[in-house]
Amino acid sequence: MSSPLKNALVTAMLAGGALSSPTKQHVGIPVNASPEVGPGKYSFKQVRNPNYKFNGPLSVKKTYLKYGVPIPAWLEDAVQNSTSGLAERSTGSATTTPIDSLDDAYITPVQIGTPAQTLNLDFDTGSSDLWVFSSETTASEVDGQTIYTPSKSTTAKLLSGATWSISYGDGSSSSGDVYTDTVSVGGLTVTGQAVESAKKVSSSFTEDSTIDGLLGLAFSTLNTVSPTQQKTFFDNAKASLDSPVFTADLGYHAPGTYNFGFIDTTAYTGSITYTAVSTKQGFWEWTSTGYAVGSGTFKSTSIDGIADTGTTLLYLPATVVSAYWAQVSGAKSSSSVGGYVFPCSATLPSFTFGVGSARIVIPGDYIDFGPISTGSSSCFGGIQSSAGIGINIFGDVALKAAFVVFNGATTPTLGFASK
């Protein structure tokens, strides 16, 4: 599921004059990746998206869209009233800060085709399509994204009769046709990968010039290509990996690292605790064993949810969320800004979630997403209610607090370790 969420970049001419405003284009960032670290083992880092600015209400709206939930009027109003330039909090006074002060500004360079065309994609464990803006995308729906041009790739082949379509909660959709082509990430190469070329793109993606497309890492049963579903990049890569795993080590105020085919034992502390995964819906769905707020007592309760790198925030049951914000003086749920806000002068408590008998602690700083607008004394919270979405989502707020193993063996599991 995931998110939709945020990112951005700068300029480059599109071949063939697909756009009338080439100054809005950007060049894909060169790969910032380590070479192959051993047979069947690959490691690469995300890179900072220098132009993205976090917008709380828009982040919540994108999550609704991603999961196909209609947008409530109050949330749409909050998005319309919001501004995109948020500043980092500074002991009560809002100050302008570099964009990397908010952990929603990282993207992953991916090479597609021969010769390689570099696009910056959102690695999304909440979806299963690899789709991109392309030379086939309606010109008016491209606004700053780098595009994939199949005709410039000698290895691109149209998958005859294949189409894809993803519908969103506001009734919009993204859709197009399908090519197979060579796709490489950090030295890990898959030939004949299904690359879904967008002919039509939802406005929520057009408005987000930071993302050139998505690389889905959920289960292939969630793929939307018809008449025959296509495998994800991970599923296609498994045969060449030393082990059928990938790991996410997302950073706080820093780029994260994805590893494929191995587990870096230096990236975490203690041991990894594994938990069962339900693949019924095609997601990395698991059940947390409970939670604690700050130094409070751990409350044992089952919280079923999805591990979703493509969603920025942590969405939990309303009772859990209200229990957290009740510990922050002045915090309140505000429909006018799309969720819980709190005084920027407040020090947020940590939030702990259970993985089996293990405990993963999210520091309070991770939950602070800065002033709701430049100069505001109210800040946007990183823990929000899942009530309107219908599913709990362990997004990046939770995942960056842990080293996470996505084990794609015959019986999939998720592993969490402190770091």
Curated annotation (Swiss-Prot):
CDD domains linked to this entry: Aspergillopepsin_like
UniProt keyword terms in alphabetical order: Aspartyl protease, Disulfide bond, Hydrolase, Protease, Signal, Zymogen
GO MF annotation terms: aspartic-type endopeptidase activity
Keyword Hydrolase tagged: yes
EC class of the enzyme, as a word: hydrolase
Enzyme Commission number, as recorded: 3.4.23.22
PROSITE patterns in the cross-refs: ASP_PROTEASE (PS00141), PEPTIDASE_A1 (PS51767)
Disulfide bond positions: 344-379
InterPro entries: Aspartic_peptidase_A1, Aspartic_peptidase_AS, Aspergillopepsin-like_cat_dom, PEPTIDASE_A1, Peptidase_aspartic_dom_sf
Entry's Gene Ontology BP terms: proteolysis
Domain Peptidase A1: 106-417
Catalytic reactions of this protein: Hydrolysis of proteins with specificity similar to that of pepsin A, prefers hydrophobic residues at P1 and P1', but does not cleave 14-Ala-|-Leu-15 in the B chain of insulin or Z-Glu-Tyr. Clots milk
Keyword Hydrolase appears in the UniProt entry: yes
Propeptide boundaries: 21-89
Pfam families in UniProt: Asp
Domain of life: Eukaryota
Stretch forming the signal peptide: 1-20
Family: Belongs to the peptidase A1 family.
PANTHER family linked: ASPERGILLOPEPSIN-1-RELATED (PTHR47966:SF2), BETA-SITE APP-CLEAVING ENZYME, ISOFORM A-RELATED (PTHR47966)
UniProt-recorded name of the protein: Endothiapepsin
